[in-house]
């Protein structure tokens, strides 16, 4: 999940 990982990075 690209979107989910990007959110977790923030």
UniProtKB/Swiss-Prot annotation:
GO terms for biological process: neuropeptide signaling pathway. One of its GO terms (cellular component) is extracellular region. This is FMRFamide-8. The keyword Secreted applies. Keywords: Amidation, Neuropeptide, Secreted. It is found in: Secreted. It comes from the Eukaryota. The modification Phenylalanine amide is found at residue 10. It comes from Sarcophaga bullata (Grey flesh fly). Belongs to the FARP (FMRFamide related peptide) family.
């Amino acid at each position: 999940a690209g979107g989910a990982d990007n959110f977790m990075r923030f």
